[in-house]
């Protein structure tokens, strides 16, 4: 169970509004990483995009956690197979290790991500973000998610990537993040909170009647 899922929380916001469980466009949702505030942007009586206050990023190594003598992990060098990586580590309620690569399209995320995820310096394992800088307002990102492998997108990972890139002077405070599954807009607020804006789309609906599965949800 993850502490927080940026994409998932947008979907929950859309679900509760579209299903008329709330008529509010400003809602709060409790997660294992704390209470998050969502601004639901409605179009044609349904949620189109969601802006999430993802909170203040955690940079202290012992809180992420990362085993290192450095208080803030901004230049963690790890050697994996035939490559050397420099990581900036951030927690958005869950741990992330962000590194810059030259060409994200050709990068073997599985080969390196699977090893980095379980590196001994990450006692709780980690999500690994591989980032290509296009310009100060646009980056491309692929992610190896802890316990899941490469996924099409990761909301907390996009936030962590922008925090890391800004910390290293590579990007501005508002950045468009291009992921395999679509784009997210990330803003570093003056209040030090990270704000994520992205779409939420209904893919399908169905009913679950399997007694064994229903028992697990109770």
Residue positions per predicted region:
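Active-site proximal loop and beta-alpha junction motif in alpha/beta enzyme cores
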Residues: 1-4, 9-151, 163-218
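Helical hairpin unit composed of two closely spaced alpha helices linked by a short loop
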Residues: 156-159
């Amino acid at each position: 169970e993850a502490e927080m899922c940026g994409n998932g929380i947008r979907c929950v916001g859309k679900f509760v509004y579209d299903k008329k469980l709330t008529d509010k466009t400003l809602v709060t949702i409790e997660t294992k990483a704390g209470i998050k505030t969502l601004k639901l942007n409605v179009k044609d009586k349904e949620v189109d995009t969601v802006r999430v206050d993802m909170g203040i990023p955690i940079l202290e190594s012992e809180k992420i956690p990362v085993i290192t003598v450095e208080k803030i992990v901004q230049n963690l060098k790890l050697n994996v197979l035939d490559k050397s990586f420099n990581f900036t580590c951030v927690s958005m309620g869950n741990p992330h290790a962000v590194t810059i690569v030259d060409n994200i399209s050709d990068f073997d995320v599985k080969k390196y991500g699977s090893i980095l995820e379980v590196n001994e310096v990450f006692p709780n394992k980690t999500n690994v973000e591989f980032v290509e800088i296009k310009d100060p307002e646009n980056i491309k990102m692929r992610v190896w998610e802890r316990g899941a492998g490469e996924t099409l997108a990761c909301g907390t990972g996009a936030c962590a990537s922008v925090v890391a890139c800004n910390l290293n002077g590579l990007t501005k405070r508002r950045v468009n993040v291009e992921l395999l599954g679509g784009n997210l807009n990330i803003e570093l607020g003056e209040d030090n909170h990270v704000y994520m804006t992205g779409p939420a789309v209904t893919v399908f609906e169905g009913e679950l009647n399997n007694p064994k599965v229903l028992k697990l949800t109770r």
